[in-house]
């Protein structure tokens, strides 16, 4: 592909910590090494306010002037819209008005989140999201299960875009615990849509660690004083939490994939999770498949999994392969 200038349009960017940011932070350096120039249109470039339930998520407004200038100054060869917020819709509007082709990606099940918090029917929210993707040449989706879900809501031009994992950073060699106590670890947002309380209330004689921040953090700290809440961790520190865990517990039923599952597996840590979108798409090898509708039973299964099998499973899931797929799906404007 000869194109050199890629415009990424996103409502999710640093300092946010989420799967969207992780994915693109991982692929951008590889794209740049291949000779592509990358520019990102993101919330910090606009006037914005914090999302009511999540202070770290910014809602942009008065987007037209800055969006128009971004496109006119940069003149991208490729446009990819990463999210369905105000910035994403501003990018879509510019592309349509100027007859530019674009691709997009679907990362987050906002309809499920909004239904849990505001009781708005999923069908209504999906209709709004579908509008952004309706003119997209290709809609990149992180899992087969999520692709099938979106088909039910009449999304078109869907393709599966597989994720990678940094197997150098997330590595069993980071394990440095001498503790004889079994350790169950959760990494992610501390929020009701992550179903985290199913993990917190598990009746087990094991140590539980929660890595992450979120709107329910203080409530759960007060409610579960016996659990170790350590806040957000990144880099080497995060890698140690994964590697030192005996089981990584992923209680969410609303994820589109779950990058954290891949990071835990690369660290040699088996997964306890429900048989839902995300986990069922990742844990396809019977040696590491511990899925169960009973989370405690899944934990028990995970404790029997060989750590080396978890690690070996991830060795083929490289970010280079992820970038190759990404470029195959891109289109010239």
Describe each PLM feature range.
Residues 71, 232, 240-245, 326:
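Short alpha-helical donor nucleotide-sugar binding micro-motif in glycosyltransferases
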Residues 165-182, 219:
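Acidic anion/phosphate-binding donor-loop and adjacent secondary structure
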Residues 176-211:
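Conserved donor-binding/catalytic core segment of Leloir-type glycosyltransferases
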């Amino acid at each position: 592909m000869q194109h050199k200038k890629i415009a990424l349009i996103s409502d999710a960017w640093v300092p946010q910590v989420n799967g969207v940011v992780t994915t693109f932070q991982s692929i951008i350096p590889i794209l740049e090494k291949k000779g592509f120039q990358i520019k990102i249109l993101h919330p910090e470039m606009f006037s914005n306010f914090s999302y009511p339930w999540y202070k770290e998520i910014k809602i942009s407004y008065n987007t037209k002037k800055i969006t128009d200038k971004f496109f006119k100054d940069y003149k991208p060869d490729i446009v990819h819209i990463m999210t369905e917020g105000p910035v994403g819709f501003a990018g879509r509007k510019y592309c349509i008005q100027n007859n530019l082709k674009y691709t997009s990606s679907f990362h987050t099940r906002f309809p499920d989140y909004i239904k849990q918090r505001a009781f708005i029917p999923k069908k209504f929210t999906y209709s709004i999201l579908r509008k952004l993707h309706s003119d997209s040449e290709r809609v990149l989706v992180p899992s087969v299960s999520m692709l099938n879900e979106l088909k039910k809501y009449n999304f078109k031009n869907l393709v599966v875009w597989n994720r990678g994992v940094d197997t150098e950073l997330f590595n069993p060699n980071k394990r440095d615990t001498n503790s004889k106590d079994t350790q169950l670890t959760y990494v992610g947002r501390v929020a009701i849509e992550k179903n985290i309380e199913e993990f917190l209330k598990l009746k087990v004689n094991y140590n539980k660690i929660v890595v992450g921040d979120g709107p329910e953090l203080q409530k759960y700290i007060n409610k579960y004083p016996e659990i170790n809440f350590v806040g957000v961790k990144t880099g080497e520190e995060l890698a140690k939490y994964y590697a030192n865990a005996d089981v990584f517990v992923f209680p969410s039923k609303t994820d589109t994939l779950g990058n954290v599952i891949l990071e835990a597996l690369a660290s040699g840590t088996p997964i306890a999770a429900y048989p839902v979108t995300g986990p069922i798409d990742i844990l396809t090898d019977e040696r590491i498949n511990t899925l169960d509708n009973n989370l405690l039973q899944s934990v028990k299964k995970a404790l029997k999994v060989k750590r080396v099998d978890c690690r070996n499973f991830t060795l083929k899931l490289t970010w280079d392969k992820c970038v190759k797929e990404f470029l195959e799906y891109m289109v010239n404007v």
